[in-house]
Amino acid sequence: MVGTPLFSNAKKILLLGSGELGKEVIIEAQRLGVECIAVDSYENAPAMQVAHRYHVIDMKDSGSLRAVIEREKPDLIVPEIEAINTDTLKEMETEGYHVVPTANAAKLTMDREGIRRLASEKLGLRTAKYEFADSLDELKEAVKRIGIPCIIKPIMSSSGKGQSTVKSEFDIEKSWDYAKSATRGIGTKVIVEEFVNFDYEITLLTARTAFGTKFCEPIGHIQIDGDYHESWQPHPMCSPTKAKAQEVAKKITDELGGYGIFGVELFIMDDEVIFSEVSPRPHDTGMVTMVTQKMSEFEIHVRSILGLPVNVDLSYPGASYVIKSEIYKWAPEYDIIEASKLKDTKIRLFGKPVAKIGRRMGVALSTAEDVSVARDTAKKAANIVKIK
């Protein structure tokens, strides 16, 4: 049952994290008559611009997080980022609040150690070989055992922040310092992963709903140092490998529980499926679904958490390409005229108040009968958007 926003019978969502993904979540929730409250650590974040109201707090601070939850008394608490005090979410859940998909899922997936041990040691899923290190000396020993090249990541970070590739022993200290600079939360622990020479990597968007688990078509993507640059859908997979990928995705999402969409990242190597990571929320590579699917990942997420049926069918092949800033500018302006002239192409600007060098400020979305054509068009569109 959904009531009327701003009245006593309203269904209320409290969104923790108000970036570009959260913005689309709120837009979809608004379409279904849900009252939306956005929370982030800075003013005028993208999702705040489309919410009924917002709060600026440090979501890692237990007292601040508890205060805003108790003030708003939401029906659903929807984490959109990792930088949240998940211990407080677990406490609030025991007090009767509903955390999406569950507080335990939010806690496990913000911590690479927790989710990796769950996937590998409890569920027996194949992963890259890994070790954890809590000091530079421990890291050096771990690298020796894993081998070079290898990947170093903070156990708590997002969007590839702090991730680097060690190509020689001379890179280890630099990678350690970089990981420490980007960690979210307390501590400096990192994960050391073997370098997987995969054939390709995909995101398998997996929707857990009251009507069962559904899988979107595989999304291919390119990440540079863990940061999404482009994605496309569908990525071709043979039926047996796709079935294996769906089996892996179902195992990990069933273990996490709750309803909503999960972005399951997988490496494919010689038709073997290797688990990488999972996010219990819409995934940045899934922005392509805004033009490729009958329902975007954002609509699927909102409908799933409201107990409504979803449609994961593909409408058109398509691609996305990130628009990044090359300047530092407060309140930037965008020239999108030429990009908007390209066939079957849409530009989505996130509305971030500050442009920073390398920061994602928007995305180009293109459809075509052939994925490769869509990829070329989206890349061209993104590259001709001018940020001033």
From Swiss-Prot:
Biological processes, Gene Ontology terms: 'de novo' IMP biosynthetic process
Residues binding Mg(2+): 265, 277
Entries under PANTHER family matching the protein: FORMATE-DEPENDENT PHOSPHORIBOSYLGLYCINAMIDE FORMYLTRANSFERASE
Annotated N(1)-(5-phospho-beta-D-ribosyl)glycinamide binding sites: 20-21, 80, 284, 352, 359-360
Keyword field: ATP-binding, Ligase, Magnesium, Metal-binding, Nucleotide-binding, Purine biosynthesis
One Gene Ontology molecular-function label: phosphoribosylglycinamide formyltransferase activity
Species of origin: Methanococcus vannielii (strain ATCC 35089 / DSM 1224 / JCM 13029 / OCM 148 / SB)
Pfam families found in the cross-reference section: ATP-grasp (PF02222), PurT_C (PF21244), RS_preATP-grasp-like (PF22660)
GO cellular component: cytosol
Gene3D superfamilies noted in UniProt: 3.40.50.20, ATP-grasp fold, A domain, ATP-grasp fold, B domain
E.C. number: 6.3.1.21
Reaction catalysis annotation: N(1)-(5-phospho-beta-D-ribosyl)glycinamide + formate + ATP = N(2)-formyl-N(1)-(5-phospho-beta-D-ribosyl)glycinamide + ADP + phosphate + H(+)
Protein name: Formate-dependent phosphoribosylglycinamide formyltransferase
ATP-grasp domain sequence ranges: 117-306
HAMAP family to which the protein is assigned, alphabetical: PurT
Top enzyme category: ligase
Quaternary context: Homodimer.
Coiled coil residues, start to end: none
Record-listed ATP binding positions: 112, 153, 158-163, 193-196, 201
InterPro entries with a match to the protein in the record: ATP-grasp, ATP-grasp_carboxylate-amine, ATP_grasp_subdomain_1, PreATP-grasp_dom_sf, PurT, PurT/PurK_preATP-grasp, PurT_C, Rudment_hybrid_motif
Family, as annotated: Belongs to the PurK/PurT family.
